[in-house]
Amino acid sequence: MRGQSKGKQTSKKTAPSKSSNGQGLAMVIDSKVNKRDEGIFYLLPSEMSKSGLLNPEKFDSCDIRNVEVDDIRPSALLGILSSLKPNGTVSVLICEPIAVMQPYEARMIEANAKLAGFTDIKTSPATFFNEFSNQEDETLCVTFTKPEKPLF
């Protein structure tokens, strides 16, 4: 199972704070979350391809975490692209405990985001809490933005 270890992992990274106070709506795709918050729409990774069925340009941001990198395909990202407002951002936290694999997986996400039509693709260092080892692990976070005008 690439992209996740056998142990439980959770992320301390949260959805944008502007969504929790009612100013916008955020989408969170997470395999470890089963709660409801006002202003946040949760999806399981298995439902990621259905994001294209949601109202177009509804969400301000999307936060993806605890998802296998192989599930973050261009077709799934295209659905997310259509449901985001212009200049909406997507943040993908790579929860891979094997540090050597993180740059490879980040490049794979970057390529898939570019194929889906996103711009301003950036990778930066981040941390996540690995419940299996009970410690903070260093990882990478890939962010990208929906352009104001479609690329194609």
Predicted regions: what they are:
Residues 2-15:
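Intrinsically disordered, Lys/Arg-rich low-complexity segments
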Residues 13-53:
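Class I SAM-dependent methyltransferase SAM/SAH-binding core
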Residues 48-64:
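A short acidic, Gly/Pro-enriched loop at the edge of an enzyme's catalytic core
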Residues 67:
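Hydrophobic adenine-recognition pocket in adenosine-nucleotide-binding enzymes
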Residues 73-89:
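A short glycine-rich, Lys/Arg-flanked "PGG" loop and its adjoining helix->strand segment in the class I
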Residues 91-115, 136:
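Conserved class I S-adenosyl-L-methionine
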Residues 118-130:
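Conserved S-adenosyl-L-methionine
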Residues 128-152:
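Core SAM-dependent methyltransferase catalytic element
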